[in-house]
């Protein structure tokens, strides 16, 4: 009975700890531009997206596993903080900070629960499985959808260049070519033309099809 109580207390400690994810605010605004979203909202949104959009994955995926991966992958930011997509200095120390955070936070759980969650987070980071690749697609597309809905507000505030977006999204098509192709042609193009994204690449001024250009940023050779 005592062991069962200790197990439950560890689980509840973890559950209380991850409530802090609601206090980690991202740079992306909500669709109505009223405020910035938090990590918990981001995770929930991507989980629903995966349930609805998994049919567009390049490879067959385990939807439940992918949903779980997305729900837990940003928990590390409770300790490590949110690293803005285009913060190069922050990204230099991001992995080290997040690895340490993952070990502490998932370590709050009983070992047989904490270790699988740590492994699931590491699988997402490694990007070697169909689930991890599709999860990355969701992680990159979700803020793009909100930026689109909010009139490109975050892009304008940070003077984001197209080269930065393409660099960040060079692996997005590895999870879903169809979703990336849609986003490239229907979201990025629109916001470049409206001036919300600085077109330092000249991609959309060329007569060649946009998809031909976007493929330059989605292959392993782009690393």
Task: Please identify what each model-predicted range represents.
Residues 10, 111-152, 164:
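Histidine/acidic-rich helix-loop-helix segments that form or flank divalent-metal centers
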Residues 76-77, 142:
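Short active-site segment of divalent metal-dependent hydrolases/proteases
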Residues 90-104, 158-172:
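Divalent-cation-assisted or electrostatically stabilized phosphate/pyrophosphate-binding catalytic cores
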Residues 217-223:
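Conserved small/polar residues in nucleotide/adenosyl-binding loops
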Residues 17-42, 85:
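Active-site flanking loop/helix segments enriched in acidic
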Residues 34-64:
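Alpha-helical phosphate/pyrophosphate-handling elements in metalloenzyme active cores
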Residues 58-68, 109-121:
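Acidic/histidine metal-binding catalytic segments
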